[in-house]
C-alpha cells in the first residue's frame, strides 16, 4: 500500500516564508553588489523591505485560507518593494493565492499549479522572454522541472531539489550573455559575464524554501 501524500499545512507555509525572509536579509549585500554591476543597485534594500513587511504580516495574520493569505502577502510585497522585483514577486504570490483559494492544506499538485501560474504571471508582467537574461531564465526551467517531477510521482523533496537544480542551471546558462530586458539592458556589454540579480534572488528563495 502506498503511503498517504504529504500535505503542506499553514504552519509549513509560514515557516517557509520566514526562512525566505531571513535568507534575503542575509544576502542583502550580495544582491546589492550584483545589482550595482548591472542596474541601479536597489535590489538588496528592496528585498530587505519586502522581507521585513512579510515577516510582520505572517506573524500577525491567520493562514487558515492559504489562498487569501498568499494573495494578501503579494499585496504587502508590492507596497513594501515599489520596484520591478516587488511587482514580480507580488504577481507570483497573488496568482498562486488565487489558484488555491479556500484551501488550508496544499498537495504536490496544488504546488505545481501555483508554480506554473506564478511563472506565467511573471513572464506576462515582466514581458521578458527566455534568453533575455532575467529571472525568467531561472524560474521557467525550475517550474517545468518541478511539475515534471511531481507528474512522475516524485515526492516533494525530490521535486524541490530538481526545481532548485534547474534554477541554478538556468542562472548559470545566461551569465555569459548580454542582458536584453529591463534596466540591465541599458548598460549593454557590461552585463556579459555578470550573474543576473533576479536569477540570483530566485535561487536564494528556492534554497530557503527547501532548507
Residue ranges and their predicted role:
Residues 1-211:
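N-terminal loops that bind phosphate or other acidic moieties
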Amino acid at each position: 500500500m502506498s503511503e498517504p501524500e504529504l500535505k503542506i499545512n499553514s504552519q509549513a507555509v509560514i515557516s517557509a516564508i520566514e526562512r525566505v525572509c531571513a535568507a534575503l536579509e542575509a544576502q542583502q549585500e550580495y544582491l546589492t553588489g550584483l545589482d550595482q554591476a548591472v542596474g541601479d543597485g536597489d535590489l538588496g534594500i528592496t528585498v530587505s523591505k519586502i522581507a521585513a513587511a512579510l515577516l510582520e504580516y505572517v506573524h500577525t495574520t491567520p493562514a487558515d485560507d492559504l489562498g487569501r493569505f498568499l494573495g494578501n502577502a503579494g499585496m504587502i510585497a508590492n507596497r513594501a518593494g515599489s520596484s520591478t522585483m516587488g511587482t514580480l514577486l507580488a504577481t507570483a504570490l497573488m496568482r498562486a493565492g488565487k489558484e488555491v483559494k479556500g484551501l488550508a492544506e496544499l498537495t504536490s499538485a496544488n504546488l505545481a499549479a501555483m508554480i506554473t501560474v506564478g511563472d506565467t504571471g511573471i513572464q506576462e508582467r515582466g514581458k521578458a522572454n527566455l534568453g533575455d537574461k532575467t529571472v525568467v531564465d531561472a524560474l521557467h526551467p525550475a517550474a517545468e522541472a518541478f511539475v515534471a517531477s511531481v507528474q512522475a510521482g516524485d515526492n516533494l523533496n525530490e521535486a524541490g531539489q530538481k526545481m532548485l537544480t534547474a534554477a541554478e542551471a538556468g542562472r548559470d546558462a545566461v551569465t555569459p550573455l548580454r542582458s536584453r530586458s529591463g534596466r540591465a539592458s541599458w548598460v549593454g556589454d557590461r552585463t556579459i559575464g555578470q550573474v543576473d540579480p533576479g536569477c540570483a534572488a530566485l535561487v536564494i528563495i528556492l534554497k530557503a524554501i527547501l532548507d
